[in-house]
């Protein structure tokens, strides 16, 4: 049964809520083997109709969630490659889907947006704790902390390049 939000509840505009919305879209798309666009559109419609499974996002937060979902869709191979370099000794198939999806979203954001790493990591850890297993928060924090340290020594990747373009110098 779908719960409905109370009338008059104001939309939220936090990046954390947008990240959680994007995570839920990614998780549902992966689980149902559905296109990201299809799931995003359905989730947006459910949100607008008052389904409280999804936070009521304001326009800015919804645009940020869209940027994360679309960006990850376009850059997933690069994001997965960065994660594989960071997570040694783990196969993606060994990881909980929740942890992997949280890591993918945060890694995309750390690689391709100007957002500072600490709030990205903090939000990812909170989402992992909320939706994942007992050790998800620690695991996500460790992986993203390692990624952040490695990125401080590497040049930042540009956000708006085509999928076929490599990092620009």
From Swiss-Prot:
Protein name: Transcription antitermination protein NusB
InterPro entries (UniProt xref): NusB-like_sf, NusB_fam, NusB_RsmB_TIM44
Family: Belongs to the NusB family.
Signal peptide: none
Alphabetical UniProt keywords: RNA-binding, Transcription, Transcription antitermination, Transcription regulation
HAMAP family recorded: NusB
Example of a GO cellular component annotation carried by this entry: cytosol
């Amino acid at each position: 049964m779908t719960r409905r939000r109370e009338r008059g509840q104001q939309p939220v505009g936090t990046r954390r809520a947008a990240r959680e919305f994007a995570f839920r879209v990614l998780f549902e798309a992966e689980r149902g083997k559905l296109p990201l666009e299809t799931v995003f559109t359905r989730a947006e419609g459910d949100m607008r109709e008052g389904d409280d499974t999804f936070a009521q996002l304001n326009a800015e937060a919804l645009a940020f969630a869209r940027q994360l979902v679309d960006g990850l869709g376009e850059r997933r191979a690069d994001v997965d490659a960065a994660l594989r370099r960071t997570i040694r000794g783990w196969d993606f198939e060994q990881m909980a889907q929740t942890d992997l999806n949280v890591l993918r979203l945060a890694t995309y954001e750390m690689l391709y947006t100007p957002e500072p790493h600490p709030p990205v990591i903090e939000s990812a850890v909170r989402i992992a704790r909320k939706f994942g297993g007992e050790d998800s928060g620690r695991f996500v924090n460790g992986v993203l902390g390692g990624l952040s340290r490695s990125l401080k020594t590497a040049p930042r990747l540009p956000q708006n390049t085509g999928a076929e373009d490599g990092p620009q110098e």
